[in-house]
Design a protein with these regions (language model features):
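Expand to "…catalyze enediolate/carbanion chemistry for C-C bond making/breaking, isomerization
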Residues: 1-208
Length: 208
């Protein structure tokens, strides 16, 4: 079903004159790319009108919806969990950002893109000094507290100790630095850090 929807959307994009498209997951690269290849392969070419940038104005819209500390907390937990997996040699990790809470919510496989999105969401709220529905101000102090609380909760729920607990503490400090970097418009990817770089961050002062 998802593949069919993606294929239909990319077919529409190709027919509007776009030569290639963006897809969220590598699994859908073929289904997303085929409409462009097939149309271009048929000899079809976009018209001159389709090349006019004014046909595609950029729209910057602020989405409507509640802003909650709980949402920021879930992103903080996801980020700590992901960085822990990275430190443990995994580029993707099954993460339940609602672990320990009532209800059925299985872990979802998350990768580096999710880590970057969680980092960006938190950093945006800090940069814009967003207040949640209950009036809480998003600043470094709040984010630091959420990272600490979620790390503590992960360790407690998993009854972790020793090396495993230490890895989560290390992940917490790296996550904090990653968020701090984004608020300074430094979008360096986690993949560009060496093990030595990450060790220095973990051994250094708190970023937040």
């Amino acid at each position: 079903m998802a593949g069919e929807a993606i294929n239909a959307g990319k077919k529409w994009e190709a027919e509007q004159g776009f030569l290639r498209g963006w897809v969220a997951h590598i699994f859908h690269m073929k289904v997303a790319g085929d409409p462009f290849k097939e149309l271009i392969g048929s000899g079809w070419k976009p018209s001159a009108e389709m090349r006019d940038p004014s046909r595609w104005p950029v729209r910057l819209e602020v989405p409507k919806g509640p802003i909650t500390v709980e949402g920021t907390r879930r992103n903080a937990r996801m980020l700590v969990e992901y960085v822990e997996g990275w430190l443990n040699g995994r580029g993707a990790k099954g993460i339940d950002s609602l672990a320990g809470k009532p209800g059925i919510h299985p872990a979802l496989m998350e990768d580096l893109a999710t880590g970057r999105m969680s980092t960006a969401r938190i950093a945006q709220r800090v940069l814009h000094r967003v207040r949640s529905e209950d009036g809480a101000l998003h600043d470094f102090a709040l984010v630091k507290r959420l990272l600490q609380e979620e790390t503590d909760d992960i360790i407690k729920l998993g009854s972790l100790s020793g090396e495993a607990a230490a890895r989560y503490r290390k992940a917490q400090k790296i996550a904090a630095q990653w968020i701090r970097n984004y608020t300074a418009f430094d979008f360096r990817s986690l993949g560009s850090y060496t093990r030595a770089d990450l060790d220095r961050i973990a051994a250094g002062p708190e970023a937040l």
